[in-house]
Amino acid sequence: MTAPTLIPKYKPLFDAPENVRYFIITGGRGSSKSFHVSDAVLKYTYSAGEKILYSRRTMTSAHISIIPEFTEKIDMYEVNDSFYVTKAEIINITTNSGILFRGIQASSGNQTAKLKSLQGVTCWVLDEAEEQQDEDEFDTIDFSFRKKGKNTRIQPEKRFYIAGEQ
């Protein structure tokens, strides 16, 4: 299979400088945001030690909406033997790096404490970030992932309130 042609504006997702912490991904329906983010995140799993947290406000239907975006790439690149896929995570068995799918809000309320307790997160993707209106809650999760000597990439998708935008 020939690798897909990537849209140039998404190139920084694949080869960002070390000092870049945030990528804010914007675009309308059909702008290939989900395609490029899932492609980049899947490729991150080929580096040992990557622990990617992929979150939305709620993740009740991740197995029918988000995870298929990743399994599509796994099929497209014909690397099925390299991945173990469940309803809550995708593990690259060649590197032991993985993607964890978690909601910020559980059905019983806020789940921030559980997200903060995740150790070693190297990348956080906040999908549908416009649903995340509580800046303090964002900061609580964001600051818990800062690791000395490790650049954690945070990728809020769509309009977001960083730098005072609301």
Model-found features: residue ranges?
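Phosphate/NTP-binding elements of NTP-utilizing enzymes
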Residues: 1-166
